[in-house]
UniProtKB/Swiss-Prot annotation:
GO terms for biological process: translation. This is Small ribosomal subunit protein uS2. Belongs to the universal ribosomal protein uS2 family. GO terms for cellular component: cytosolic small ribosomal subunit. Keywords: Ribonucleoprotein, Ribosomal protein. Pfam families: Ribosomal_S2. Residues 249-272 have a biased composition (Basic and acidic residues). It comes from the Bacteria. Residues 249-310 are annotated as: Disordered. SUPFAM superfamilies: Ribosomal protein S2. It comes from Streptomyces coelicolor (strain ATCC BAA-471 / A3(2) / M145). The lineage of its organism: Bacteria, Bacillati, Actinomycetota, Actinomycetes, Kitasatosporales. PANTHER family: 30S RIBOSOMAL PROTEIN S2 PROKARYOTIC AND ORGANELLAR, SMALL RIBOSOMAL SUBUNIT PROTEIN US2M.
Length: 310
């Protein structure tokens, strides 16, 4: 089953590109035709690229990776926040801070600062031990950090891949990802450079419906990857991996259980063998008794014979 249909792409306007005077010649191979001064993107190619990107994202997440959603333009902000939150992934939908990937250690300190500020009760002035002015300054700092870093609050390391809407607007994010060799999955409009993107999806990055549809597809891939990951984790809990060595205490426990089972089995076998050993002894005892009986019979017959002679 296809991830998305041609009809959905057409209804969302994914096929509309930019004006013919605003284009990147490298995108020529993805353009189907030109109509009324606007390029029309080849949706057959888009479908195949969507399937590839979907599989890549699913496999990345299934193997424990994370995908950062990036889209700061107005058309993408709502879809990015909604879909990333749905699948529990980090996102940036306001301003991209320079160094958010390449200088993540500093960004992480700011995230810790945000968590500290969230512990303060700004309504209770007396309990905080701060003046109203100090609380006001801290609340403004908290609001600023929440706006810029709220989407990546739970991120503890750089992501395994990034999903980007409009690579021209997010050129700083693309540059940082490429510098760290982080795979880039992105929508490519007719004015973008396809060489900057690892997993491209030719499409319209300006229409809200187009951006929402493609972002939802990537979020669905993440969701499927998470399901696969949880299934694999559940299977691993049930039984140890074949090549995984046991801990020393586990080995001792296992050997102790085996020894106990062996002793129990031997104890159960001994009573069963005893009757078998007694049976021949009983037969041996009965045999002489049986032989003695015929020997006694002639002795009993002898007096009878003497009486007849008398």
């Amino acid at each position: 089953m296809a991830v998305v249909t041609m009809r959905e792409l057409l209804e969302s306007g994914v096929h509309f590109g930019h004006q013919t005077r605003r284009w990147n010649p490298k995108m020529k191979r993805f353009i189907f035709t030109e109509r009324n001064g606007i390029y029309i993107i080849d949706l057959l190619q888009s479908l195949s690229y969507i399937d590839r990107a979907y599989e890549f994202v699913k496999e990345t997440v299934a193997h424990g990776g994370t995908v950062m959603f990036v889209g700061t333009k107005k058309q993408a902000q709502e879809a990015i926040a909604e879909q990333a939150t749905r699948v529990g992934m980090p996102y940036v939908n306001q301003r991209w801070l320079g160094g958010m990937l390449t200088n993540f250690s500093t960004v992480y300190k700011r995230l810790q600062r945000l968590k500290e500020l969230e512990q303060i009760d700004f309504e209770d002035v007396a309990a905080s031990g701060l003046t109203k002015k100090e609380l006001l300054v801290l609340s403004r700092e908290k609001a600023k950090l929440e706006k810029t870093l709220g989407g990546i609050r739970e991120m503890s390391k750089v992501p395994s891949a990034v999903w980007i809407v409009d690579t021209k607007k997010e050129h700083i994010a693309v540059g940082e990802a490429r510098k760290l060799n982080i795979p880039v999955v992105a929508i490519l409009d007719t004015n973008c450079d396809p060489d900057e993107v690892d997993h491209k999806i030719p499409g319209n990055d300006d229409a809200i419906r187009s951006v929402t549809l493609l972002t939802r597809v990537i979020a669905d891939a993440v969701a499927e990857g998470l399901i696969a990951r949880s299934g694999a984790a559940g299977g691993a809990k049930g039984d140890k991996a074949a090549g995984e060595p046991l801990a020393a205490w586990e080995r001792d426990l296992l050997e102790g259980e085996k020894a106990e089972k062996k002793d129990d089995a031997e104890a159960a076998e001994k009573p069963a063998e005893a009757p078998a050993a007694e049976a021949p002894a009983a037969e041996a005892a009965e045999a002489p008794a049986a032989e003695a009986a015929p020997a006694e019979e002639p002795a009993a017959e002898a007096p009878a014979a003497d009486a007849e002679q008398a």
